[in-house]
């Protein structure tokens, strides 16, 4: 059973054009918005090491160039793995076996598949069967007039029904989901708690909350959902701009084991 004692914070390293940037600027740049939005934090390895030094046990690395078809930063992901000695999960543009093997070869503990779950379902099922707990599925969700739809290709395309996909993935044995309301990613508008509760009600696999965290209160509220299956939260924009320091986030959600 998931509990507050095991709730994890996943500080993010969002990579665009070879640089780690604030989540908001990274997301908007990959959507083709002005380059004046660039808000660099440093090299991916430098940023990951800073999060490790602040107490993180996991790092969440996002290759937004790969996710949006603009290129690959696999060499920089390898640099991150060489710089830290904590767990790393990687996502972005991992859509076939060749790319998956290349990313796993960096030594990362987990890979998140997103677009592939919709566009390459047979291979996705094979990956889940072969790699087990090393595979999580990113459910990037957009609310539409037709219900919850999945956002793919760096959140630039909407397709597929959330509940249909979740049912199929559960049958295929998916062991973990990363659930993000894409309208809240990088926006610090608070997580979509209703969405998280609905997903947890339909699967017994653990869920990581992605996107929208704006305060310590948001993190405490997410940790309270550990009883229904939320095992952690990705911390991006609020961390990157200093609104929620990582040390405070860890203390607020993991105090029972400190």
Curated annotation (Swiss-Prot):
The active site is at residues 14, 140. Pathway: Amino-acid biosynthesis; L-histidine biosynthesis; L-histidine from 5-phospho-alpha-D-ribose 1-diphosphate: step 4/9. Its EC number is 5.3.1.16. One of its GO terms (molecular function) is 1-(5-phosphoribosyl)-5-[(5-phosphoribosylamino)methylideneamino]imidazole-4-carboxamide isomerase activity. GO terms for biological process: L-histidine biosynthetic process; L-tryptophan biosynthetic process. One of its GO terms (cellular component) is cytoplasm. It catalyses: 1-(5-phospho-beta-D-ribosyl)-5-[(5-phospho-beta-D-ribosylamino)methylideneamino]imidazole-4-carboxamide = 5-[(5-phospho-1-deoxy-D-ribulos-1-ylimino)methylamino]-1-(5-phospho-beta-D-ribosyl)imidazole-4-carboxamide. It is found in: Cytoplasm. Signal peptide: none annotated. Pfam families: His_biosynth. Belongs to the HisA/HisF family. HAMAP family: HisA. This is 1-(5-phosphoribosyl)-5-[(5-phosphoribosylamino)methylideneamino] imidazole-4-carboxamide isomerase 2. It comes from Photorhabdus laumondii subsp. laumondii (strain DSM 15139 / CIP 105565 / TT01).
């Amino acid at each position: 059973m998931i509990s507050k004692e095991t709730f994890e914070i996943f500080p993010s390293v969002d990579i665009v054009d070879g640089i780690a940037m604030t989540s908001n600027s990274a997301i908007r740049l990959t959507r083709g918005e002005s380059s004046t939005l660039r808000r660099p934090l440093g090299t991916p390895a430098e940023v990951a090491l800073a999060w490790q030094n602040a107490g993180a046990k996991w790092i969440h690395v996002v290759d937004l160039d790969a996710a949006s078809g603009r290129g690959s930063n696999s060499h920089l992901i390898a640099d991150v793995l060489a710089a830290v000695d904590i767990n790393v999960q990687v996502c972005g543009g991992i859509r076939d076996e060749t790319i998956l093997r290349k990313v796993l070869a960096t030594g990362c503990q987990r890979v998140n598949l997103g677009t592939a779950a919709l566009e390459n379902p047979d291979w996705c099922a094979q990956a889940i069967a072969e790699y087990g707990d090393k595979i999580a599925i990113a459910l990037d969700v957009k609310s539409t007039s037709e219900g919850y739809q999945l956002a793919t290709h760096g959140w630039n395309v909407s397709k597929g029904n959330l509940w249909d996909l979740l049912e199929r993935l559960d049958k295929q044995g998916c062991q973990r989901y990363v659930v993000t309301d894409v309208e809240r990613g990088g926006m610090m508008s608070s997580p979509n708690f209703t969405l998280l509760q609905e997903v947890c009600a339909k699967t017994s696999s653990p869920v990581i909350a992605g996107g929208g965290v704006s305060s310590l209160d948001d993190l405490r509220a997410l940790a309270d959902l550990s009883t229904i299956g939320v095992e952690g939260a990705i911390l991006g924009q609020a961390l990157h701009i200093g609104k929620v320091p990582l040390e405070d986030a860890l203390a607020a959600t993991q105090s029972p084991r400190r």
